[in-house]
């Protein structure tokens, strides 16, 4: 692997770890601040329900019951420059367990596309799915 690609992959892995820690802490404990992690025109698909734009996404999260996520797996890949208009972007895939208030523990998987905006990582696209047992 050439040194430039290796540096991109290592940066991607660090970013995925840092971003997902912040993201799930926000979803579980500071949901009123979740909008700051999304671009203004971001898209969310949450177990078949959709929201477009930061304001709609913030409203959607406010309607969800309280939660506690435990992350079990994390994978991330840099997205090639040509696919995202030469903008730095990463594909982050996470899975684990979640307990929503008054519900049983369930498995979930989530896929993000994130990009850098003013030195902050922001969600471009977010797809969250509960796993049926």
UniProtKB/Swiss-Prot annotation:
Phenotype of the disrupted gene, per the record: RNAi-mediated knockdown in the germline increases transposon expression.
Gene: Nxt1
Principal subcellular localisation of the protein: nucleus
One GO CC term on file: nucleoplasm
Keyword Transferase (UniProt): no
Domain called NTF2: residue spans: 15-130
UniProt record, GO biological process: defense response to Gram-negative bacterium; negative regulation of innate immune response; poly(A)+ mRNA export from nucleus; protein transport
Pfam families: NTF2
Keyword Nucleus carried by entry: yes
Functional summary from the UniProt entry: Stimulator of protein export for NES-containing proteins. Plays a role in the nuclear export of mRNA. Also plays a role in the nuclear export of U1 snRNA, tRNA, and mRNA. In ovaries, plays a role in transposable element silencing regulation. Forms a complex with nxf2, Panx and piwi which acts as effector of cotranscriptional transposon silencing. In ovarian follicle cells, enables the nuclear export of flamenco (flam) transcripts and subsequent piRNA biogenesis.
Family annotation (InterPro entries): NTF2, NTF2-like_dom_sf, NTF2_dom, Nuclear_transport_factor_2_euk
CDD domains per record: NTF2
Subunit structure: Forms a complex with RanGAP, Nup358/RanBP2 and sbr/Nxf1. In the ovaries, part of a complex composed of at least Panx, nxf2, piwi and Nxt1. The complex is knowns as Panx-induced cotranscriptional silencing (PICTS) complex, Panx-nxf2-dependent TAP/p15 silencing (Pandas complex), SFiNX (silencing factor interacting nuclear export variant) or piwi-Panx-nxf2-p15 (PPNP) complex. Interacts with nxf2 (via NTF2 domain); the interaction is direct and prevents Nxt1 binding to nucleoporins. Interacts with sbr/nxf1. Interacts with Nup54 and Nup58.
Protein name: NTF2-related export protein
Chain ranges passing through the membrane: none
Alphabetical keyword list: mRNA transport, Nucleus, Protein transport, Transport
Cellular compartments annotated: Nucleus; Nucleus envelope
Source organism of this protein record: Drosophila melanogaster (Fruit fly)
Source taxon at top rank: Eukaryota
Tissue specificity as recorded in UniProt: Expressed in female gonads (at protein level).
């Amino acid at each position: 692997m050439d040194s430039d690609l290796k540096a991109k992959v290592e940066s991607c892995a660090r970013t995925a770890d840092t971003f997902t820690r912040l993201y799930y802490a926000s979803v579980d404990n500071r949901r009123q601040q979740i909008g700051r992690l999304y671009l203004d025109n971001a898209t969310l698909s949450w177990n078949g329900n959709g929201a477009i734009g930061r304001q709609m996404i913030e409203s959607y999260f406010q309607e969800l019951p309280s939660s506690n996520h435990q992350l079990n797996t994390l994978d991330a890949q840099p997205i090639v420059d040509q696919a995202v208009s030469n903008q730095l972007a990463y594909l982050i895939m996470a899975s684990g367990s979640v307990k929503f208030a008054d519900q049983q523990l369930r498995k979930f998987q989530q896929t993000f596309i994130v990009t850098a905006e003013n030195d902050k990582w922001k969600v471009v696209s977010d797809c969250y799915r509960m796993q049926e047992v």
